[in-house]
Amino acid sequence: MLTVKNLCKEFDGLHAVNSVNFSVELGTITGLIGPNGAGKTTTFNIIAGHDSPTSGAVFFGKQEISGMKSYETFHLGIVRTFQIPRPFSGMTVLENMMMVPGSQLGENLWNNWIRLKQVKRQEATNREKALEILEFLKLEALRNEPSMHLSGGQLKLLELGRAMMSKPRMILLDEPAAGVNPVLLEEIIDRIREINEMGVTFLIIEHNMDLIMKLCSPILVMAEGSIMMQGSPEQVRSDKRLLDAFFGE
C-alpha cells in the first residue's frame, strides 16, 4: 500500500500541497483529478522522489519514501511516467526500450561504461523482453523506427512500455490521455487494464474525465492543494456541485 500522511509542500510561503492524506491499495487503479494548480503534479513529484515535502510523509508498505531520490523509489518498484514523453529522440523504439533499466538507476555514464561487459551479457535478455512488451503494446512493427517519428499516442504507449521493462510494482501515470487521438486512447485504456491484471498498481493524474471514469476506482478529487473528495466513479459523478465547481461541467 502507498500511504500519504499529512503531506505539505510550500513554495515561497504558498501551500501547493496542504495536509494531504490518502492511500492507494495495491492492485487498484486509483485516479487523482482536479483543476490546474490543484497540487496533483507536486504530489506525484514527491511520491516519485523528484521533490521532497516540507512536512508530512509518504510510505510504500512500511518503508518511508518521502525524501528519497527518484532512483531509490525506482529500486522499490515505483515508476513514474510524464505528461510529455521523454524518449531518446535519436534512438529507435527498440533502443529506447532497452535503455530504460540503466537510465533510471542514478548511475553516471562512466559507471555504465566500466560495466559494459555486464550490460552486453544482459542485452539478449533485454532485447527479448523489449520485443515481447512491444508486441503486447502493438508497437512491434515500429521497433526500428526512430522514436521521433511516433505519434503522441504511440509515444504514450512507448512510455508505458519503458515503465514495464523495470518490472514495476506501481506506475505513476501523468496525463496518459494528453495529446492522444480517440482510437489510441482506447488502446492505452485496454493496456492499462491488462497490466493492472498482471498485478501492477496504478495512480493516475488526468484531466480526461472519460478515462478516469472508465478506469479508476477509487477517485480522489483535489483542489487548492487538498483532497476534497474520495469515492467511486458513481459517487464522484453524482456530486454535480463538485464537478461544476472544479471542472465547469
Predicted regions and their residues:
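Conserved ABC ATPase "signature" region
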Residues: 110-142, 190-193
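The feature captures the beta-strand-to-loop junction immediately N-terminal to the Walker
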Residues: 33-35
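Conserved catalytic motifs of ABC-family nucleotide-binding domains
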Residues: 167
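Conserved ABC transporter NBD signature motif
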Residues: 56-63, 75-76
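Catalytic Walker B motif of ABC-type/P-loop ATPase nucleotide-binding domains
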Residues: 171-175
